[in-house]
Amino acid sequence: MKRTVTCSIDLGLTGPARLVYSVAVAAGIPLADESFTLTVDGAPVLPTEITDVHGTRLHTAYVDGSTASMRYEAVVDGIDAVPVVGDADDIVYLRPSRYCESDSLAPTAASEFTGLSGLDLLQAVISWVNDKLTYVTGSSLPTDGAVRTLLARQGVCRDFAHLSIALLRALNVPARLAAVYAPGLSPMEFHAVAEALVDGQWWVVDATQLAPRQSLLRVATGRDAADTAFLTNFGAATQLNGLEVTAVVDDFALDDTTKLTQLR
């Protein structure tokens, strides 16, 4: 499978800041070609690359100017290995987190999914979240978590993922968020899905059902969107002036949502 992805981010800067980009495909994915460029006021800046325990690759730089422009391109030829299960995964990803308030949603989870476990539970959560929420672009705030999403009954991909994660954790199923490139997604943008740890394997949980899971390409992995944002800045405020994402696959296939799959 050959997948090609691009991303461009244009920022307005108001002063010195540290920019942290999380747009590169995760470490370990077989790359045929890749480039990452950053310019500040038109001059090239060399970022530092940092890789975390799950293979998330961060590109960070200290900048001072009026504009910053980032361009990323990658060609992936092949698939990644099966996601590794870390020694602490079944602890870290059972805890409530900033956007996944599993403790608050425990009564809801217990009443809605009584008697279900394993892969049957994953399918039930996917169907339930898909039924309860409506995908509406721009309907949620950056501060919205799973509880507010359920009350609003609408959201975007990260909101669907946060609610799925919170419900699963409340049912003692470790769950986490993955930021991905998603060939077939419309409108095209960064996508977020949940992953659930069942029978010793991480399985994709995407209640939006907006893109084929087999083609998804991992970028970042974490507890929730706080760990996986495509851009973080520390210091002076920044303004997003432009964002464009593309993702295509050479062998596009329809998704059989009755079967479980893994991020590869």
Describe each model-derived feature in a short phrase.
Residues 21, 82-88, 206:
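Short, charged, solvent-exposed linker or helix-capping segments at domain edges/interfaces
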Residues 23-32, 81-83, 148-153, 158-161, ...:
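Short low-complexity stretches enriched in small and charged residues
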Residues 21-23, 36-38, 72, 109, ...:
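Generic structural hydrophobic/aromatic packing signal, biased to beta-strands
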Residues 13, 80, 84, 90-155, ...:
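Secondary-structure boundary elements
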Residues 42-49, 56-61, 104-113, 211-217, ...:
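Low-complexity, flexible helical/coil segments
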Residues 127, 159-237, 241:
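Hydrophobic/aromatic-rich core segments of domains that either
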Residues 32-36, 45-48, 62-64, 95-100, ...:
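Glycine-rich loops and low-complexity Gly/Arg-rich segments
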Residues 1-79:
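Intrinsically disordered, low-complexity N-terminal segments that are enriched in acidic
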